[in-house]
């Protein structure tokens, strides 16, 4: 007769010690409940092993995704859960194609340009969040982050070395180019990033200006080769229409009512 009582403490302690030694965190956490269930329901040993290994695999996958989300440094936590496809000027078939992430796997770039408030940053971040959920590594910057990176490594000329871990990402997002004046350091940082990522890592940028107008933001000697590399393998999407944020504000959707 199979006993349904608790697993002997000595056995539990040994399993815990072995799991710690082998760094099987999720098996260690779930083995007490799994083993009790397996004993009560008379599982086949192979099924018990399968359930424990699946718990470890799923736990590690969750941990990896959370780590990638943290290192991506997304600014606002915007995902497709809050995305209103029907309010975007981007055609729905194009939105669906972008969400497939096949362009990331092909190391192609994405440029989303258009007026303020038309969903450029939201779309970029939602794509980045989706990429993380599907196992990709993502990094998020605004253009002044790149300027700060250049300045911090100028003295010892280690900017190329500093970019190496960034370039391990599957997708690099640079947000809001052209929203503010671009410093020479930021322009250099953007060029160095685009040049180093060329044909190896996907870069997505959002901008109030079409890249053909980047020479209004930075010296043409940097803008020209930067745009050449950025657009060579890029999908260019131009958003249109009035600001969605302003429309929500005018309709009273940007705040909770003070009185009900």
Specify the residue positions occupied by each region the protein language model found.
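N-terminal pre-Walker A segment at the start of P-loop NTPase domains
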Residues: 78-99
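Phosphate-binding P-loop
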Residues: 99-107
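Walker A/P-loop nucleotide-binding motif
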Residues: 107-123
